[in-house]
């Protein structure tokens, strides 16, 4: 398009943003209006995208990081012919695909859910990494950010990583409209303040007037021709551009324009400009979902193997069988054992350094490009990336997260390293799967299972060695459990997983020597939980004792209660968990101090029997 046509298209995008928000009675039209010219030039002159084939491997990828400006995105979809005007006016209404913030579960042209600011660029880095190192394709990744979100630390994790990886297929456009939600942003219209920061991370930067369509066009062309480094286009804009009543005025964020019809007239009225978006380059998917039978590692019963070791060996084996599996780690691969994958498949291993938000975001970006990512770090450090996990669920993203060094059983490193909240936070994620293996063969099987699941999958692994109690051919279906001790004379049931499963078995054997029979359930699938087995145990033994190397809130005890949320009577339940603040000690001392070792389980069972709390 020529200059006049681009100006007209920008005005159309503003008008349609105003109309959509007015029809909804809510939304963010002023945030959309500031970026309308930036979007118009990109859509008409530079984006290569087949809207009829959103999965085309050669399509450019666009991420609207400032997701509240969704009216602008939907107006662009209308201009490209992907939606019609009738659908545009369903914005924010019940049943509409056009939600307040865009999600890929509703619209196939959306790469990732945004709206929690500071996430679009990190995910865009993941997509760009896939393009450069995995797909070896010529597609471009464009990310439109707001200036307010430049205060987010995750943005600068992404900027540093993109510069380090020389992602010249990535362009970020920063819409510097000066105003955030409650008032001015930190740097206002100081474009150089943003440019200096990007340059410090080895980006090429371009500062422009974000309402000069010719300058925008030149900047995009310069970005496309820049080699060896990503490009940041810093654009000075005005919030509410084009409507005097709201232009560059505070207090106009997140609300429809009060006089929408007058605003539309001031913008020149509705238009019906259609954009013929450039076709993508021919490309093909280079990875395969499967190349052969997975030959998992096999461990002998009775051996002492850390589940983290089994995870690393199993992941390497799954990577051999599946070309779509990739691994990411937060610079602790020698501890998580992700290094085993790195040695076997270095071209599919991504070192993300101590930047857990960027690591999870990169996993989401790679999943958007059809990969099956496994992202690993200490369980405790995944808490830092929790909002990215939450948003990944909203995206419907399929990612595998693995948290090692879980619980007090890590010993002397102390509480800062102990993941004690991870089961709770991962169980709370919509549609998640949470797995906690107790031995090496179980771990290997569950890693293979995870690769074929949907949604957010979490595997909890342990630092210390544990005895192999299952054979290598044992099956562990997700949603299942294993009953390891059982008799007709069971007085109660102990439910455990991971480290405490071994403690429960030792306690059960000691009790059995004194004639007290105890059932033991290995609840390796913490979510979904095996309701049938738990209900049967409650009915047959009358009392459940849960034991977990985790906080009481949200972990195995609460997972067990989920089996009785359909109106069934809740059984007598005793919950042993970590309730104090641990310190530094040996693993055995830590487990005992927390009251979750074999001795504590045995004492609890004896108390229940001796005080006739259980029959």
Where are these regions (language model features)?
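Thiamine diphosphate
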Residues: 1-142, 272-460, 465-466, 613-615, ...
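Residue-level marker for buried hydrophobic side chains located in beta-strands
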Residues: 143-144, 172-175, 402, 436, ...
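Residue(s) in the substrate-gating loop at a strand-loop-helix junction
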Residues: 147
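Short active-site segment of divalent metal-dependent hydrolases/proteases
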Residues: 150
């Amino acid at each position: 398009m020529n200059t006049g046509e681009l100006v007209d298209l920008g005005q159309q995008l503003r008008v349609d943003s105003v109309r959509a928000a007015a029809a909804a009675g809510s939304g963010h039209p002023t945030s959309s209006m500031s970026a309308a010219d930036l979007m118009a030039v990109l859509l008409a002159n530079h984006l290569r995208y087949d809207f009829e084939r959103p999965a085309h491997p050669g399509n450019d990828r666009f991420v609207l990081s400032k997701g509240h400006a969704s009216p602008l995105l939907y107006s662009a979809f209308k201009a490209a012919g992907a939606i019609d005007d009738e659908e545009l006016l369903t914005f924010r209404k019940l049943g509409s695909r056009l939600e307040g913030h865009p999600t890929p579960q509703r619209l196939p042209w959306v790469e990732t859910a945004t709206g929690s600011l500071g996430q679009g660029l990190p995910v865009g880095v993941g997509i760009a990494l896939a393009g450069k190192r995995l797909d070896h394709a010529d597609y471009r990744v464009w990310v439109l950010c707001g200036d307010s979100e430049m205060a987010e630390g995750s943005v600068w994790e992404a900027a540093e990583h993109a510069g380090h990886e020389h992602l010249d297929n990535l362009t970020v456009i920063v819409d510097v409209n000066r105003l955030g939600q409650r008032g001015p942003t930190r740097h206002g219209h100081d474009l150089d303040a943003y440019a200096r920061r990007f340059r410090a991370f080895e980006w090429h930067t371009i500062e422009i007037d974000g309402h000069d369509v010719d300058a925008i066009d030149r900047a995009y062309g310069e970005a496309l021709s820049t080699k060896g480094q990503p490009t940041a286009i810093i654009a000075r804009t005005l919030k509410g551009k084009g409507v005097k009543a709201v232009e560059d005025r505070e207090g106009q964020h997140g609300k429809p324009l009060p006089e929408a019809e007058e605003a539309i007239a001031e913008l020149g009225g509705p238009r019906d400009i259609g954009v013929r978006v450039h076709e993508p380059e021919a490309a093909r998917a280079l990875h395969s979902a499967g190349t052969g039978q997975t030959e998992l590692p096999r461990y002998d019963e009775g051996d002492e193997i850390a589940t983290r070791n089994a995870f690393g060996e199993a992941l390497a084996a799954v990577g051999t069988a599946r070309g779509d599996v990739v691994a990411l780690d937060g610079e602790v691969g020698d501890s998580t054992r992700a290094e085993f994958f790195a040695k076997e498949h270095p071209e599919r291993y991504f070192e993300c350094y101590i930047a857990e938000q960027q690591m999870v975001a990169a996993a989401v970006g790679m999943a958007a490009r059809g990969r099956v990512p496994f992202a690993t770090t200490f369980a405790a450090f995944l808490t830092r990336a929790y909002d990215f996990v939450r948003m990944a669920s909203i995206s419907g993203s399929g990612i595998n997260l693995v948290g090692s060094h879980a619980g007090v059983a890590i010993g002397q490193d102390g509480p800062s390293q102990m993941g004690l909240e991870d089961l709770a936070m991962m169980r709370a994620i919509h549609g998640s799967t949470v797995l906690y293996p107790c031995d090496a063969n179980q771990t290997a099987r569950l890693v293979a299972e995870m690769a074929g699941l949907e949604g957010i999958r979490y595997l909890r692994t342990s630092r210390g060695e544990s005895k192999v109690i299952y054979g290598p051919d044992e099956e562990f279906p997700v949603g299942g459990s294993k009953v390891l001790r059982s008799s007709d004379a069971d007085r109660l049931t102990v439910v455990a997983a991971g480290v405490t499963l071994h403690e429960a078995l030792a306690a059960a054997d000691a009790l059995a020597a004194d004639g007290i029979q105890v059932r033991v359930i290995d609840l390796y699938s913490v979510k979904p939980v095996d309701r049938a087995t738990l209900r049967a145990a409650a009915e047959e033994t009358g009392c459940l004792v849960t034991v977990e190397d985790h906080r009481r809130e949200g972990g195995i005890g609460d997972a067990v209660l989920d089996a009785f949320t359909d109106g069934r009577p809740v059984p007598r339940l005793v919950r042993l968990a970590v309730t104090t603040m641990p310190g530094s000690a040996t693993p055995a001392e830590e487990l005992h101090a927390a009251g979750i070792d074999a001795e504590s389980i045995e004492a609890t069972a004896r108390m229940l029997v001796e005080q006739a709390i259980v029959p």
